């Protein structure tokens, strides 16, 4: 336990602070000539309130040290947030000195390890700030107040309000593969600009692969900066004075709101400590310091950029990444020609096979020395520098392997389909790692005189030892067999007796986290729903029941009411795809059942039910949502839809956006449900496939006119939903008279007359922000334009509602609404009234089959940050 930290023990009913008396200097300014020594690890320069300290920390498990900034008041090993010498630990002879010239120098045995390069720049003093930023300060007369700061040279951590500009990047500690490291920085690709994560090869500074990107910020103006704000939201700010913001992650809980309320009541509450870390496994993860009431404290993860570890390039070195049984961790497999590394630290990683190329270049009889090994359903990440050739007119799969064998520099080749057209990539390196891909085949060049899988380190001595060991084991086969049989019987008995308790543990450890869907048996779901006795509702795809898992966790179980055309494997594949989508405004898919003909989905339970119960209630005000809540729901719903339209790995058209499919949690945070239940479409496809249903009143005109269905159909449905949120009523409501039964026509009239507040739910009695009402109505009418090209994307809708775009022009009246009005609302009303009386239950449109067929390809699995050279 380090003596840097403060401790707060308690005895009986008395609590007191017990501080270890160490020489932590809390001077506000550090003068020229001040020093810190690694041989005196209990000395450090500390911020005014003791939150952060800069000094030397031990580089475990060695006896060397790092110059570091860390959280000074937290128990346990120091949580380091900055270090300039991570790759060059120093001995106990090291010294940090603020020299008389104003230069901050780290030296070890008279050798300079690192310097701030601020000699003769007017530095007068230094200070460790409460924000975690170490500053070298001048005077107003010389070079200004701040001459150098640690925030301008970030390591692997971003602290609240620490700017990450276009010229800066976070860099991880070396990855476990030892071949590379990860970085977070602004990526300029062709005409796009985004915040991205890349894997970089150490020996080749130009070899890198981008495997994750944040929202596209190509169209923003002014300086662009990524920042973690005080509320725990990670965003990109831009424009003059950074007034615009695009969220990478928006924290649903505003800690400052609770903090301010406590302050107003005369209470004290420590601000929440957070850090955003680029870990050496390639994931960008947000942590919050959690002080438990029971006295235990720890860093708790709040958000991660990547949910599937196999989406991270280089996580398995040059091996192939598979998910383990928990679906949360990477399980690394080696290709033919390579073996698991023997040292324990790299037990999951594989040896290199680059020697094949060298041997090939020095061997005259090249083809006779090597052969091709085939690895099914496997693809590889690669960059432009990894590629020898891309062959698009390959005749068959086998030909792709033969092409690699005939090329001396080829290490492997990948065959797959791109928009149903075959391709073959000839690769000279596999540094970025592989992943499972059902649509691809990998061909690996291996030595002809060896069979695989095998251990290339085998020698005669090891073979003799293993042979002798096998002989000894065979002496007692009967005894071993009996012991195994008894053990198996005991395990089987224990499993049967303890099944229910095991289910509860699994649910608590896996289901609640919802990182990946959990497989249930049909009997499991019968038990947790009390034989499907508590009906929550019926939707376009099935019936939903309330259930309880592990005796305490509420879930919603949807039983699909139609037989799916595809088999169990395809169903599970789609379930895993949906389950991998994590967004605060999407309902999490936590589990599934695929047993015989049963197909069920298990979702997180939303205590406040669906949005329609809150905006279409009667004159009673019990369920009345105020305007602020409505507008926040509208914005958040748009963010959720924009996510699966534009940001997730598989582009999805929802096809049934309506209030019944917008669920509300206990904080009235909206979550879109039923996404992905219609067929998924590849990023290169523009038409949705068969088995799609929608609800009348929310369907875009192209459904009726048999035009291609794109994501803009969801935009239309969202526009109709947004109108209903504003008006607090159905767009088509036969309980109104002929003049008012059609809300869009009435609302458009109020918008153009400048009396938009009259279009707001009458129960609110005019209590609403008029500017937001006008904005919502304009966006809604742009969304429901008849011409698809005139509708904005959902990403643009979010910007319009959040106010990060320019002034919204008045949209033209949609043609269908105009024709309806010109036809005469009185006649239309009478006709619809007759239909309403005759067919009360006819509310859904049956299955619509588009003319486009769908066929899966490797391209359909592309992430938004895929390399232009990679089929992924």
Swiss-Prot record:
Domain (Protein kinase) ranges: 530-810
Chief subcellular location: membrane
Record domain EGF-like: where: 306-344
GO-annotated biological processes: recognition of pollen
Binding sites annotated in the UniProt record for ATP: 536-544, 558
Sequence intervals crossing the membrane: 473-493
Topological region Extracellular: 26-472
Native source species: Arabidopsis thaliana (Mouse-ear cress)
UniProt protein name: G-type lectin S-receptor-like serine/threonine-protein kinase At5g24080
